[in-house]
Every structure is written in C-alpha cells, then in structure tokens.
Amino acid sequence: MKKLFNRITEKQARVLTLCLLGAAAVLLGAALWLNLRAGGGGTTLTTYAMGSYIQQTVYGAGAEEAAQQASSAVTELENLISWRVEDSDIATLNQEAGGEFQDIDPQTWDILNTALQVCQASGGAFDITIAPISWLWDFDEEPHLPQASTIESLLPAVDYTQLSLQEDGTAALRSSSSALDLGAVGKGAACDAAVAAYQEAGVERAVVSVGGSVGVYGEKPFGQKWQVSVRNPDTDGALGVLSVSSGFLSTSGSYEKQFTEDGVTYHHLLDPSTGYPADSGLLSVTVWSSSGALSDALSTACFVLGLEDSLPLLEQFDSQALFITQERQIYLTSGLEDAFTLSSGDYTLAGTV
C-alpha cells in the first residue's frame, strides 16, 4: 500500500499547472455557484488550493483582510488533511498504518470524527478508507478501468472501522493495508475553515465556494436569501436556483469526473462495497447542512445509497437534499420544498420526499 501511495504522490506537482488556466475558467464545470447580488461593496478573491479554485465574496469592514485570512485557513487545512502533502496528518496516518497512535491537529481530528460518524450512520456507503480503491482508478491524473482481480484484492482494505480516534486527540489506522482519502469531505471542510475565519474577523456576511461546496455566512440585507445556482448535469449552465440562509451546500455528481473506456462511462463516485462507480439511479445529490464537512460527506453517502435509502440518513443529521435522478426528475426533501426554482425545461420537478 505504501508503494502505491508513494507512486501517486509523485504526481502532485503536475496538479499545480491548473493554476495557469486563469480566473475566467473558475465557474466552468462547477457544481454550485453563487448569484452575488448582496447590495454591492463586496471584496472578491479567487485563489487555488485543495485541487480547486476558491472563490470568495466578503462584505463589511475588514473584508479584504478577512478574505486573505480565509484563504490562508484553507491552505493550512490542505496542509493538514491532504494525503498528497508530505508530513500532513493524513499522510502520516497512512504511512504509519498498522502502527502506533499519532498526534494530529484538533482540526484534523474533528473532520475525521465527523466523517467517521457518516461512515457509521451510512453503513459504509461513505468510507474515508476508500483510498486503496480510489488511487487505483486514479480519476485525477490517469483514469482507467482497473483489473477486476486487483479491485477484489484491495476491497478488504476498505473498512472505516480500522480508523481509531482517541479522546486525547490521537488517531491510528489499525491495519497496515488501510489508507485515508478525505477527498469526499475536504472541500466542505475548507468552507468550514473559511467561514470560521469570517466569524473571527467579524465581517458582516460572506460566501465561499470550493469545488462542489459552498459556505454562506451572515444574512443579506432586508432578509433576502442567498441565491445558489445548481448545475445542469448535461451542461455547464444552471439547472435552477436554491434560495438559502446561512449554512453549507455540497453537491456530488456523476458528471464531475468521468471517463469512457470501451464504450462504457465510469464516474468517480465509488461504491465502497464493490469498488466500482455507484449505480444508484442518481445523477447528483446536493445536501444542505449546518457544517461544510457534514454536507460534503452526506452528499457522497446519499449518492451511493440512492434516494430512498438516503432519507433516514438525512433526518439523522438534520439535513436537507435535492436529488436529480437518471430519469431527469428532481426530488426535494421538505426543508427545501419552497427553496428551489427550476430553470431548465429538460428536467421535471417530481415533488418532495
């Protein structure tokens, strides 16, 4: 496992070339983006970290400094939780798998704890020890269909129960075959870090977008809602708009990363029980929650579980969701029933669940 880990980390430098794409490409392909009509006067900042562009718009006194602080907070988080970053908490846990408990940053511990709760509650539909399988598919760099025998041989290593968290702030992977990949929770956690920076800076309101996750802090003037566009799975345009108050949204969609081999299209949302892309009848799931890390983890879990089996999970974590099915129908949980406005004629609002 460590040999595979070391091979993949050598690709890290190539990711940095994405920064040359320019700010004009930031929204292209984003799962969620904000319609920023908050009365003007906002400070905008676009940076790059965690394999994604980070877009911010911050309002109020000290907005520019707050945006810089939030950007730094996201970079600091990446240096803690990215398995690609040498000596990060996650890289250390992976390298020391099967060994002693490791001291980790409280922020890392909290994210792992949130992720582990979703692993347990979803029955493993979400599993942060998916790394041996996700590295094998290599959707970020050289996506390909692995040999079935290789997938089968690595599946036993996917087992979230091998992650142990202690109250003293330490953590360990009990099996030497285990490895962590927080890609399915990291963008939401980055939104958490940014919003915490806004709170500390005392700004009036702010919005941040990291990959498929959005964090909204504070209220717009006159009680207006924030307008968040949801991507049409078929295009880079908007499917519709969600009107929300402070909170966090994350989308997991099969269109985000995919490749076609021998006439078959494979997406990056892997089912931990099979090692292959999840086939749950969904195109995407957008989850609203009070935590970015939680919304990110839940969106992945719900995509793997499918619509019906997701509902108890969402209720357990007091979260809401928008489901888009392969039949081009849109379902909303009751908390979002009046929050979504459909703008695409290619999809149908099928009701609430």
Give the positions of each predicted feature:
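Mature catalytic core of soluble alpha/beta enzymes
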Residues: 2-353
